[in-house]
Amino acid sequence: MLRVTVEDLGTDLRLKVEGRLAGAWVPELEQSWRTLIRRSPGVSLIVDLTDTEFVDLAGTYLLSLMYRSGVQLRANSLYMKNVIAEITAQAGAKCI
C-alpha cells in the first residue's frame, strides 16, 4: 500500500510518500508528481521518503526521473538513503 500526501511549505511543496513504492503504486506517485508540477510550475518539490519502507526497480526509476527533473529526495532510513545514493550517483551528483 502507498499513501501520498502534499504539504505546502510556502516556497516549496512536500510530497510525502508512505508505504511501499512498488508495482501498481508507482504510476500513482507518478500521476501525483506530474499533476503537482503542472499545477505549480516553478515551485520547488521535495519528496519525503522518511516513511517509505520499500522501493522496487520501477519505483527507483521513477525517483530517478523525478530527481533529474530537479526534485529533492529526502530520507532518514539507511535503506532509503542507499536508494537515493544510487540515484544521485547515476546522475553524477553527491548524496545529500
Q: Where do the model's predicted regions map?
A:
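STAS-like cytosolic regulatory interaction modules
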Residues: 1-96
